[in-house]
């Protein structure tokens, strides 16, 4: 047994050292730039027509709008934690999910430059569509799960092209992403 892998701390260090520097840069760049860009939305309650109708016990339209997996996720999270609109909590979860997505994209494109990786993470998380998503903060974490699923599906297909089971899992991830919010299919393509 590897001495570094014998403790949880050693395992974390081993995994951390295997992550390319550009991927880490994209991840942390997305977090920092995401917080700088969206902190006003996270620290203030900005209501809109949809949120007034769906708070405190909703997550948006479900299967009737083709968002069958949003209904499943919303029901699961609603049963466990309740459906609340907490901008800071929802925003931090969303930024984390989008930062992971930015890191996966940096890995897919095999980026070497830390500066370009930070720029990728920054552009990815400060894109106007993300700002628009954060105006519907009560459902933003679900939509960011859809982004992560779509990017993860593409990453798995590129990283493991000859693994049939992972390719099938990628298709399932794409289907679930489409079942949350159809607009994020372009992330996979």
Across the structure, where does each feature detected by a protein language model lie?
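Membrane-interface micro-motifs in multi-pass membrane enzymes
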Residues: 63-67, 90-94, 115-158, 179-184, ...
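Short, Lys/Arg-rich, polar N-terminal cytosolic tail immediately upstream
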Residues: 1-19
């Amino acid at each position: 047994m590897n001495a570094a892998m014998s403790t949880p701390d050693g395992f974390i260090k081993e995994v951390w050292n295997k992550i390319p520097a550009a991927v880490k840069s994209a991840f942390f760049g997305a977090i920092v730039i995401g917080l700088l860009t969206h902190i006003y939305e996270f620290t203030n309650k900005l209501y809109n027509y949809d949120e007034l109708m769906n708070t405190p016990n909703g997550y948006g339209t479900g299967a009737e709008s083709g968002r069958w997996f949003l209904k499943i996720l919303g029901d699961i999270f609603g049963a466990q934690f309740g459906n609340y609109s907490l901008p800071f909590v929802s925003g931090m979860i969303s930024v984390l999910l989008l930062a992971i997505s930015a890191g996966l994209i940096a890995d897919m494109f095999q980026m070497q430059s830390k500066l370009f990786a930070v720029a990728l993470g920054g552009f990815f998380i400060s894109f106007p569509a993300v700002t628009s998503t954060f105006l519907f903060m009560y459902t933003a974490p679900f939509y960011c799960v859809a982004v992560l699923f779509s990017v993860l599906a593409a990453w798995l297909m590129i990283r493991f092209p000859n693994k049939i089971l992972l390719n099938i899992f990628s298709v399932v991830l794409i289907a679930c992403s489409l079942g949350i919010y159809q607009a994020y299919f372009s992330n996979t393509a």
